[in-house]
């Protein structure tokens, strides 16, 4: 099994696209990249901990590759916005691919270069690619949010879905 960590704005909106893929064993919402041990949602939202909301994905590389996950990640984000994603603003919502080893870093960097060269976006691709740091699970009420709260999830993801349809379909 392998692990991937992606930050792409509100973690609620990052779970479902990955959970629907064959070879995914788990997708958990949490926080990473900051300087506070095991922060709470309230602490992360205060923008004082340095953490980003992210998802940790455990996957079977014999069924789905890390490269496939990176491609799926791009299609869930606005890679030209370094200051948050969609209606969620601030460092805690910035887009980041966290790599767990050198191979993942190389795949992510190559994929970013390919996306930049594709001309899909007029602006530069600014998503960060950074080494993985400790990942802290978010509170239980954040886990599987789209399943537990479908109406609120639909409202919170509407702007994202509109952007994705315009730029990734």
From Swiss-Prot:
Classification via PANTHER family: PEPTIDE METHIONINE SULFOXIDE REDUCTASE, PEPTIDE METHIONINE SULFOXIDE REDUCTASE MSRA 2
Cited function: Has an important function as a repair enzyme for proteins that have been inactivated by oxidation. Catalyzes the reversible oxidation-reduction of methionine sulfoxide in proteins to methionine.
Protein name: Peptide methionine sulfoxide reductase MsrA
Active-site annotation: 10
Cross-referenced InterPro entries: Met_Sox_Rdtase_MsrA_dom (IPR002569), Met_Sox_Rdtase_MsrA_sf (IPR036509)
Family the entry assigns: Belongs to the MsrA Met sulfoxide reductase family.
Pfam families: PMSR (PF01625)
EC code(s) of this entry: 1.8.4.11
Catalytic activity: L-methionyl-[protein] + [thioredoxin]-disulfide + H2O = L-methionyl-(S)-S-oxide-[protein] + [thioredoxin]-dithiol; [thioredoxin]-disulfide + L-methionine + H2O = L-methionine (S)-S-oxide + [thioredoxin]-dithiol
GO molecular function: L-methionine:thioredoxin-disulfide S-oxidoreductase activity; peptide-methionine (S)-S-oxide reductase activity
Keywords noted in UniProt: Oxidoreductase
A biological-process GO annotation: protein modification process
